A protein has these predicted regions:
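GT-A fold catalytic core of metal-dependent nucleotide-sugar glycosyltransferases
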Residues: 98-150
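Long, low-complexity C-terminal extensions of enzymes
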Residues: 250-312
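Secondary-structure boundary elements
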Residues: 27-32, 104-115, 189-194, 227
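Conserved catalytic core of nucleotide-sugar-dependent glycosyltransferases
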Residues: 131-192
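Conserved glycosyltransferase catalytic-site signature
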Residues: 15-19, 92-95, 99, 119, ...
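A structural signal for short, well-ordered beta-strand segments and their strand-loop junctions
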Residues: 35-38, 113-118, 123, 140-141, ...
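Catalytic core and acceptor-binding pocket of nucleotide-sugar-dependent glycosyltransferases
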Residues: 168, 172-259
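N-terminal anchoring/stem segment of glycosyltransferases
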Residues: 1-88, 107-110, 286, 290-312
Length: 312
């Protein structure tokens, strides 16, 4: 199975997340290749290093089933700013690029299972069951979130009003259709090309309506993959979108130690076995009034003293 990550821009936090995610997935022998679609290939030179030797027992090179394997090969698929603009399509919907990156990987390696993950994810269990289910034709997304008919957010309400009753790409939309989190997308080799093409068509069709765009690419994948068996994987893959600041600190420390110790990629992959995935919450949301109070305090009580270096 191939793993796919999409990264872009100059924010090093995002790229460190991607490296950390890749290392966590490379512990599992079912991941044979890591594909990184990025406009900053220079950030992945260490990850692409040649010292990805087999993980020994002492290094912890095994998955939850006890199998040993090689650290996965890493392949960079470079893209340009022009590519990113083109991928946004005629309606210039930014997150259409996710669907295009998945389509690119499917074309690059047809006939192979593909697991796309957002950079802010990690593997904490075994992929053995997922691989079996993919082989049987099931697809994966991270987790079920809600149905279009649910009334738990303004964005969902606006989406429902714009889409329910429409027929898009042969699908008559109703309040029963489900929204799944697209932080993980697992595609079986047997239907990957077909489902990605359908997701792209659904995305473009929704962009042509007055539907709010924030969830369009996620709903497009959800609709396309609901045409078959769709499963959750949140019991083995963590998605810390709701607590990035805390996880970024953990990741920065992990990668700094890897470089200070001059670890090989294989050694860093093995050290992933020491990470306590339950130590930090995946989601940590403050009440709005707390955030406002902090802002007022910062404004009313500025630092007592600030001093910068002055060259002689």
């Amino acid at each position: 199975m191939n793993l796919l990550l999409l990264t872009f821009g100059d924010n090093t936090d995002n790229h460190q997340q991607a490296v950390f995610a890749a290392l966590s997935f490379m512990r599992d022998p079912h991941i044979r290749r890591v594909l990184v679609v990025t406009d900053r290939p220079d950030f992945y030179r260490w990850l692409c290093g040649t010292e990805r030797n087999a993980l020994s027992t002492e290094e912890g090179g095994e998955d939850a089933s006890g199998k040993h394997g090689m650290a996965a090969a890493v392949e960079i698929l470079p893209i340009t700013a022009e590519t990113l603009t083109s991928w946004q399509g005629p309606q210039q919907f930014f997150w259409r690029i996710k669907i295009q990156a998945v389509a690119m990987a499917v074309r690059q390696y047809p006939g192979q299972h593909l697991l796309y993950v957002d950079s802010d994810t990690f593997l904490a269990g075994s992929l053995a069951d997922m691989v079996r289910q993919l082989g049987a034709g099931a697809a994966y997304m991270h987790c079920f979130e809600n149905r279009l008919g649910d009334r738990n957010s303004r964005t969902l309400t606006r989406t429902r009003r714009a889409l329910v009753g429409r027929t898009l790409e042969g699908i008559m939309l109703s309040g029963r259709h489900e929204m799944w989190n697209a932080g993980v997308i697992g595609l079986p080799a047997s239907t990957a090309a077909e489902r990605v093409a359908q997701a792209l068509q659904l995305c473009d069709a929704m962009c042509a309506t007055d539907c709010p765009r924030r969830l369009i690419e996620q709903f497009a994948f959800s609709l396309a993959l609901q045409q078959g068996t769709l499963r959750s994987c949140q019991d083995v893959i963590g998605h810390y979108w709701g607590n990035k600041a805390a996880w970024n600190r953990l990741i920065a420390g992990f990668l700094a130690e890897a470089r200070l110790k001059d670890e090989t990629v294989a050694q860093a992959v093995a050290r992933m076995g020491q990470v306590d995935w339950r130590a930090l919450p995946l989601e940590h949301r403050q009440r709005r009034w707390v955030l406002r109070l902090k802002a007022v305090i910062d404004w009313a009580l500025p630092p007592k003293k600030l001093r910068h270096f002055t060259p002689g």
